[in-house]
Amino acid sequence: MIQKNTLLEVADNSGAREVLCIGLLGGRKSASIGDTIVVSTKSVNPKGKVEKGKVYRAVVVRVKNCIRKSDNSVIRFSSNAVVLVNNQGEPLGTRVFGPVKKLPSGSFMKIMSLAVEVL
């Protein structure tokens, strides 16, 4: 579960390395896979598309918390990770690194198509 002030890794090549969750969209207290959150960049690559300290939207693609699938198997990732998106929901980067859990019902299809592995 992701809440305010959670440090997250960035799983794309937009230029950000680490972001801080500063808000959750939809009036929730915690976010899970597929939810959109508001983040602030904390560390960036010098030649990236994003700037340090700027505010962006992001989609959660991996969480450390256990996720139960419909066949009662459990998936658990080693890190909390997000993909930065613009206001229309399109990813800022052109590649997504690491495995990605299947996002809910057709939303963010572009992120799933860019991912190396979809679970």
Swiss-Prot record:
Pfam families tied to this protein: Ribosomal_L14
Keyword Thylakoid attached: no
Keywords: Ribonucleoprotein, Ribosomal protein, RNA-binding, rRNA-binding
A GO BP annotation: translation
Disulfide-bonded cysteines: none
One GO cellular component, as annotated: cytosolic large ribosomal subunit
GO molecular function: large ribosomal subunit rRNA binding; structural constituent of ribosome
InterPro entries noted in UniProt: Ribosomal_uL14 (IPR000218), Ribosomal_uL14_bac-type (IPR005745), Ribosomal_uL14_sf (IPR036853)
Subunit text: Part of the 50S ribosomal subunit. Forms a cluster with proteins L3 and L19. In the 70S ribosome, L14 and L19 interact and together make contacts with the 16S rRNA in bridges B5 and B8.
Function summary: Binds to 23S rRNA. Forms part of two intersubunit bridges in the 70S ribosome.
HAMAP family, per the entry: Ribosomal_uL14
Cited PANTHER family: 50S/60S RIBOSOMAL PROTEIN L14/L23 (PTHR11761), LARGE RIBOSOMAL SUBUNIT PROTEIN UL14M (PTHR11761:SF3)
Family, per entry: Belongs to the universal ribosomal protein uL14 family.
Name of the molecule in the record: Large ribosomal subunit protein uL14
